């Protein structure tokens, strides 16, 4: 068995075309979604990622802006900028690129974003809505993972799904989404005993811990679906996933590559949530 490669770039391309069509439809009502991104400091990876989001938004017809603040910017100034964006009727979605400098509290900043413009889905209100099954902004990487599974026609009902990692960004929300899809979900973490036994039972594995080579051929059953969220740079700057890709693709039924798997869908879902925010505030959702 050779695994089906779940090509995130192609899935994202198709999804973004659908978003572009919806943006064009929205423009007929006189509304154009706008994404505002706050970047504090000069972290190279953050700058690159923010530029990718801006470019992707503009490519599908949205307006996008980057508010680039100096590394030494105070928390008060960041919160003031957020307040301005919260009250700007032209802004559909807001996100703050992390990590933030040490003088700025990430939690305070995330809680200061208007929940109706929180396209990252990290505001406590939106996290709470996710867990009581209300419509909300779902964190983008978990949403992207579910789109990959949907695109591949993978039926999750009754399947054993194992999630490695319990972060609020990926592990916990994707576990909730898998549960909503009627999978039986197990979360593994650094204190889990006998991790291999759990992995061996998994029909679907989502690994999101940033530990290259964690999941190997020895702890995956034949025919499992593997979603690799890891993206750790090696000494040459090449991205490595959590999964031993070359050996596991010989026994899995489907697998995401790194890079080019989950990553393209994460940015796509930022655009998805920005469009949703604009539709919701204009009363244009069905």
From Swiss-Prot:
<comment type="pathway">
    <text>One-carbon metabolism; tetrahydrofolate interconversion.</text>
</comment>
<keyword id="KW-0028">Amino-acid biosynthesis</keyword>
<dbReference type="InterPro" id="IPR000672">
    <property type="entry name" value="THF_DH/CycHdrlase"/>
</dbReference>
<keyword id="KW-0368">Histidine biosynthesis</keyword>
<keyword id="KW-0486">Methionine biosynthesis</keyword>
<dbReference type="GO" id="GO:0004488">
    <property type="term" value="F:methylenetetrahydrofolate dehydrogenase (NADP+) activity"/>
</dbReference>
<dbReference type="InterPro" id="IPR020631">
    <property type="entry name" value="THF_DH/CycHdrlase_NAD-bd_dom"/>
</dbReference>
<keyword id="KW-0511">Multifunctional enzyme</keyword>
<comment type="function">
    <text>Catalyzes the oxidation of 5,10-methylenetetrahydrofolate to 5,10-methenyltetrahydrofolate and then the hydrolysis of 5,10-methenyltetrahydrofolate to 10-formyltetrahydrofolate.</text>
</comment>
<dbReference type="GO" id="GO:0005829">
    <property type="term" value="C:cytosol"/>
</dbReference>
<comment type="similarity">
    <text>Belongs to the tetrahydrofolate dehydrogenase/cyclohydrolase family.</text>
</comment>
<dbReference type="Pfam" id="PF02882">
    <property type="entry name" value="THF_DHG_CYH_C"/>
</dbReference>
<dbReference type="InterPro" id="IPR046346">
    <property type="entry name" value="Aminoacid_DH-like_N_sf"/>
</dbReference>
<keyword id="KW-0554">One-carbon metabolism</keyword>
<dbReference type="InterPro" id="IPR036291">
    <property type="entry name" value="NAD(P)-bd_dom_sf"/>
</dbReference>
<dbReference type="GO" id="GO:0000105">
    <property type="term" value="P:L-histidine biosynthetic process"/>
</dbReference>
<protein>
    <recommendedName>
        <fullName>Bifunctional protein FolD</fullName>
        <ecNumber>1.5.1.5</ecNumber>
        <ecNumber>3.5.4.9</ecNumber>
    </recommendedName>
</protein>
<dbReference type="GO" id="GO:0006164">
    <property type="term" value="P:purine nucleotide biosynthetic process"/>
</dbReference>
<feature type="binding site">
    <location>
        <position position="190"/>
    </location>
    <ligand>
        <name>NADP(+)</name>
    </ligand>
</feature>
<keyword id="KW-0658">Purine biosynthesis</keyword>
<feature type="binding site">
    <location>
        <begin position="165"/>
        <end position="167"/>
    </location>
    <ligand>
        <name>NADP(+)</name>
    </ligand>
</feature>
<comment type="subunit">
    <text>Homodimer.</text>
</comment>
<dbReference type="InterPro" id="IPR020630">
    <property type="entry name" value="THF_DH/CycHdrlase_cat_dom"/>
</dbReference>
<dbReference type="GO" id="GO:0009086">
    <property type="term" value="P:methionine biosynthetic process"/>
</dbReference>
<keyword id="KW-0560">Oxidoreductase</keyword>
<dbReference type="Pfam" id="PF00763">
    <property type="entry name" value="THF_DHG_CYH"/>
</dbReference>
<dbReference type="GO" id="GO:0004477">
    <property type="term" value="F:methenyltetrahydrofolate cyclohydrolase activity"/>
</dbReference>
<keyword id="KW-0521">NADP</keyword>
<keyword id="KW-0378">Hydrolase</keyword>
<dbReference type="GO" id="GO:0035999">
    <property type="term" value="P:tetrahydrofolate interconversion"/>
</dbReference>
């Amino acid at each position: 068995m050779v695994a089906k490669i779940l090509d995130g770039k192609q899935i994202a391309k198709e999804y973004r075309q659908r978003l572009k069509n919806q943006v064009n439809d929205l423009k007929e009502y006189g509304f154009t979604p706008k994404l505002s991104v706050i970047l504090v400091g000069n972290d190279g990876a953050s700058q690159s990622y923010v530029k990718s989001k801006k470019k992707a938004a503009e490519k599908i017809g949205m307006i996008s802006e980057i508010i680039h603040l100096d590394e030494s910017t105070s928390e008060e100034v960041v919160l003031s900028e957020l307040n301005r964006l919260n009250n700007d009727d032209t802004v559909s979605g807001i996100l703050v690129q992390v990590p933030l400098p040490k003088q700025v509290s990430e939690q305070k900043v995330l809680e200061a974003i208007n929940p109706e413009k929180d396209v990252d889905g990290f505001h406590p209100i939106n996290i709470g809505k996710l867990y009581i099954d209300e419509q909300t902004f779902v964190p983008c990487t978990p949403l992207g993972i579910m789109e990959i599974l949907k695109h591949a026609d993978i039926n999750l009902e009754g399947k054993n799904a194992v999630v490695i990692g319990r972060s609020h960004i990926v592990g916990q929300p994707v576990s909730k989404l898998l549960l909503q899809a009627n999978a039986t979900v197990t979360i593994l973490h650094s204190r889990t005993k006998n991790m291999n036994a759990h992995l061996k039972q998994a029909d679907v594995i989502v690994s999101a811990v940033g530990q290259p080579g964690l999941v190997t051929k020895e702890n995956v059953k034949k025919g499992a679906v593997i979603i690799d969220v890891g993206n750790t740079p090696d000494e040459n700057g090449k991205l490595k996933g959590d999964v031993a890709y070359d050996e596991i693709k010989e026994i899995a039924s489907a697998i995401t590559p790194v890079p080019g798997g989950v990553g393209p869908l994460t940015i796509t879902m930022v655009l998805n949530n920005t469009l949703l925010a604009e539709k919701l505030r204009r009363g244009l959702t069905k």
